[in-house]
Amino acid sequence: MSHLHVLPPRFWLADSVISMSEPMSPSVGLAVVHYFCKPSFEYDGDALVAAVKAAEGAGVTVITVAMLGHKADVAVMGVAADMRELKALQTGIQHAGLDIVDSYISLTEVSEYSKGMPEEMLNARLYPQLPPVGKNAWCFYPMSKRREHKDNWFTLEFDKRKELMEEHGKSGRTFAGRIIQLVTGSTGLDDYEWGVTLFAVNPDDLKEVVYTMRYDEASAVYAEFGAFYMGMVTPVEELIHQI
């Protein structure tokens, strides 16, 4: 009679833990997460500073934002090659006594309509240098393309979609020097298809760019938006005294 040798379950568990601890990185580009937070009674400003510094030491770009309005008191935006470092940042934020009341997960990407764009422009989208100097007015919102029967973006021919997006991009380029925009992809990762992060010199620039681009057909007919969050980019050492 033959006998099968079966490893004890603990060895399988050990192997799975080892594999799970490996970096979780996109094949191209970077992972991006936006955390929107409110302080709990256990809030510890020094612990928040330590969490941010630890993440930065691990190679994460961290942008801290003093938020306006009731939705959140602080936003922490993390950009990293390894999602596990973003998870460590999330844990540090929570251990500092901040309750995460909303969040958004996405990846840097280049548009399917960007064929022929210079390599340096493509790299700027995949590996952005953030935050931009002098642009401390900050806004984030998620969006998707409409899928209604009459206005279904995904049933349009590629050339038509490209034409509409080129028109949309032309409107955005009129704000060069005033706005830095980061569009990140989130299909299959979060509730919408893209996340849009805007940096501006003045808050009215944020309002004007969104208003202007709403008139483009790609937005007016085919776009759906989630909640908007607005705040001011603020160093974490200052931010902890504003929470």
Language-model region placement:
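Short S/T/G/P-rich N-terminal loop/turn motif that feeds into the first structured element of a domain
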Residues: 3-54, 81-85, 103-170, 187, ...
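Short, solvent-exposed beta-strand edge segments and adjacent coil->beta transition regions
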Residues: 32, 71-73, 136-138, 191-195
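A structural feature that tracks compact, well-ordered secondary-structure segments
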Residues: 35-38, 65, 77-81, 90, ...
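Short, glycine- and small/hydrophobic-rich beta-strand elements in well-ordered beta-sheets
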Residues: 53-75, 100-110, 168-192, 209, ...
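Short, charge-rich binding segments
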Residues: 67-68, 95-96, 130-132
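Short, surface-exposed basic-aromatic patches at helix termini and helix-loop junctions that form
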Residues: 89-96, 214-218
